[in-house]
Design a protein with these regions (language model features):
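Multi-pass alpha-helical membrane architecture of UbiA-family
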Residues: 2-547
Length: 547
């Protein structure tokens, strides 16, 4: 029997769902023993985020950390997959803490240690039942000790080395404690320097500044999710170097950058073009003033960008799955074509990226979650049968243009969730869609052979390479010349004319596919960045009006 995950039976997915189930049961035990309402009727969304995202992301971080430590100390006698299975089973220990505290002492109250430095300086009392730490109950200490003992036993069973086993057990317990102390250390050091003491964690300015992420618990969850992404990536690299690098190479980095540029442009647009004051919304504008007078939450914006990036990567994976026949002819280096990864495992990774992107988006706020979900649904219509709009170049170009617009609007909602789609002038919205829909025909050149074999309708498959190149050049030139007119950027008409000529030369006379793609892509980024610069910085305060 293989030591690795049998992806065909979804063992990897079952393990992660099992850990999620264990963590959710722990949430329910905690809520029940505290005597609180399951969902606060006054703020149901925040309750759900706190229990399902904040706490569960913490437990996932513990799970992946412990699994990697087990592998590190027993790696010569085990595999990363087995360590993840053992780690998942060991997570059942998290039920013990609240139950032990409640039945042994009659109460349970889980919180973060109020003075992390005090805990570190008094670790020699950790196993002393008569010594107390604020925010670190005896049940939680019991969980940490049992995790270390269990890990010690597993490492000894695999290696038969006592010193290695003891070191592994100590490292496991220390890691559990360190994860619990990490956020208190970061927030208190940020706000009070080395003056540690009793401070309210959830009142820390670090967890509230910038107003991108609404709620301290959500920002903590994002921090844990970020660490989980790093550690899960490390685990997948350990599991298979070849598969890991096959996915990295296939991430379409240029197109990823394109989506991040659109997303960043949306953020910059709303930041430099704040809503026009309206006396009837005085309280709301006090809120806006608070945003603009505080430091920008760079971590929140970074994680929002990660959500956009992961959404695109999920779309790439599913597009590769449905484009397998085309890629066999036109893109022989794709992971599925080279057999670097199985389709079932590739599909599982795509689903994981999509779920992770939605989770991050929900941590930020519901409006951003909606735009990320909308992005993923439109990407599904583009790639998946029976709709598969990708087969029809007019429909596919129009949908991709709308997806680009959705990405731009996702950026505008990050700073202001209440931002209304209809308040962007129609000439910008329709100009954006029309210009991209015309220009996107250029993407079909590189897949000509595969599209022709699979009966995909593009300008190239309908009219051939020569006429297709000419028609593509004309449409791209039209898009380039229309852009300053539709967006009311008359100062860029001459610049657009120059770029138009360069596009025409690159598309018509450059024959090698790689050189043509690189040239057109470089011209595109130069042109788009110039357009966004003038749109954002040269016409401030002219577009957005709330009434």
């Amino acid at each position: 029997m293989s030591k690795d995950f049998d992806i065909r039976h979804s063992n990897a997915g079952n393990i992660f769902l099992g850990v999620l189930a264990i963590a959710t049961i722990r949430d329910f035990i905690e809520i029940s023993l505290k005597g609180r309402e399951l969902i606060d009727p006054l703020n149901p969304s925040n309750s759900l985020k706190t229990y399902f995202l904040h706490f569960n992301s913490f437990y996932f971080l513990v799970f992946v950390s412990l699994s990697l430590i087990l592998y590190f100390f027993a790696r010569k006698k085990t595999c990363i997959s087995e360590c993840f299975k053992i780690g998942a089973l060991a997570m059942a220990l998290i039920w013990l803490g609240p139950l032990f505290d409640y039945f042994a002492f009659g109460h349970f109250d889980m919180t973060y240690p109020s003075d992390p430095l005090f805990v570190v300086c008094n670790l020699h009392h950790f196993v002393d039942p008569n010594f107390s730490y604020e925010g670190l109950s005896k049940g939680m200490r019991l969980e940490i000790i049992l995790a270390g003992l269990g890990g010690m036993g597993y490492i000894y069973y695999k290696t038969k080395k006592i010193i290695r086993s003891v070191c592994g057990g100590i490292c496991l317990s220390a890691t559990c404690l360190a994860i619990g102390l990490l956020i208190p250390f970061i927030t208190q050091y940020y706000e009070y320097g080395l003056n540690f003491g009793y401070h309210k964690l959830y009142n820390s300015t670090l967890l509230h500044q910038g107003f991108v992420v609404h709620g301290a618990g959500c920002k903590i969850a994002l921090f844990y999710i970020f660490l989980c992404i790093i550690l899960f990536s490390l685990a997948y690299y350990i599991r298979s170097h070849n598969r890991f690098f096959a996915i990295i190479r296939n991430m379409r980095w240029t197109r990823s950058l394109h989506y991040l540029v659109l997303f960043g442009a949306g953020i910059m647009f709303i930041y430099h073009n704040p809503p026009i004051p309206n006396p009837s919304l005085a309280d709301y504008y006090d809120y806006l003033a608070t945003i603009w007078n505080h430091p920008i939450d760079l971590f929140g914006i970074f994680m929002a960008s990660v959500a956009i990036f992961l959404s695109f990567q999920s779309a790439v994976i599913f597009n590769d799955i449905y484009d397998y026949g085309i890629d066999e002819v036109s893109n022989a280096d794709r992971p599925l074509v080279t057999k670097a990864i199985s389709q079932s495992e590739y599909r599982l990774i795509g689903r994981s990226f999509a779920i992770l992107a939605l989770t991050i988006a929900f941590c930020i706020h519901e409006t951003f979650f909606f735009f990320v979900l909308l992005y993923q649904m439109m990407a599904f219509l583009y790639s998946a049968p029976p709709f598969r709009l990708r087969n029809y170049f007019i429909a596919s170009n129009l949908e991709l243009a709308i997806i680009f617009l959705v990405t731009l609007h996702a950026g505008t909602t990050v700073l202001i969730p209440e931002y209304r789609f209809e308040n962007v002038p129609h000439h910008i919205t329709f100009g954006f869609i029309i210009c991209y829909a015309l220009a996107l025909v250029v993407k079909d050149f590189k897949d000509y052979e595969g599209d022709k074999k699979s009966n995909v309708h593009t300008l190239y498959t309908l009219f051939g390479i020569k006429i297709g190149n000419f028609a593509t050049a004309i449409l791209v030139c039209c898009a380039t010349l229309l852009t300053p007119l539709l967006l009311h950027l008359s100062q860029l008409i001459v610049f657009s004319g120059i770029v138009c000529i360069l596009f025409l030369l690159a598309i018509t006379f450059v024959e090698k596919r790689n050189i043509k793609e690189m040239t057109v892509t470089s011209l595109y980024f130069i042109y788009v960045l110039t357009i966004f610069y003038f749109l954002i910085f040269q016409q401030q305060g002219t577009y957005i009006d709330y009434h």
